[in-house]
Each structure stands twice: as C-alpha cells, then as structure tokens.
C-alpha cells in the first residue's frame, strides 16, 4: 500500500509563522490620534497637532532613513 504524505504539520507551521509576522506588523503600526471636538481648549488642540505631526512623521518616514546609501 502506498503511504500518503499529509502536509498538515507543514501547513500548520506556515500559518503560525504568518500569524507571528502579521502580529509583529500590527505592533509596529502607530495609532492615529483622535481628533478633538469643536469646543476643545487650545492646549488640547496643540497636543493633538503635535501628536498628529509625530504620527505622520512615523508613518511617512523613508525606509532607508539612517542607512548609509552613499
């Protein structure tokens, strides 16, 4: 009788590795700051814009930042 090779262990390991990689990507993505309401104080607006600026800098930074390209 011919033995049938079942790929269950290989598929399970591949799916587990994929889930670990996706989990690492989710952890590195920053959370977008919540927009303040219309009646917020200037201090809260200033904090929001500073957080938004930091968020945009992190999201749009170049992948080669810090690498010696030349």
UniProtKB/Swiss-Prot annotation:
GO terms for molecular function: neuropeptide hormone activity; neuropeptide Y receptor binding. Residues 1-23 form the signal peptide. GO terms for cellular component: extracellular space. Keywords: Secreted, Signal. GO terms for biological process: feeding behavior; neuropeptide signaling pathway. Gene3D superfamilies: 6.10.250.900. It comes from the Eukaryota. It holds the Pfam family Hormone_3. It is found in: Secreted. InterPro entries: Pancreatic_hormone-like. Transmembrane segments: none annotated. SMART domains: PAH. Belongs to the NPY family. This is Putative peptide YY-3. The lineage of its organism: Eukaryota, Metazoa, Chordata, Craniata, Vertebrata.
């Amino acid at each position: 009788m011919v033995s049938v090779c079942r790929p269950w262990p290989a598929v399970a390991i591949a799916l587990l590795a994929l889930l670990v990689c996706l989990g690492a990507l989710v952890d590195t993505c920053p959370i977008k700051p919540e927009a303040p309401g219309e009646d917020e104080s200037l201090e809260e607006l200033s904090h929001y814009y500073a957080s938004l600026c930091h968020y945009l800098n992190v999201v749009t930074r170049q992948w080669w930042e810090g690498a010696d390209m030349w």
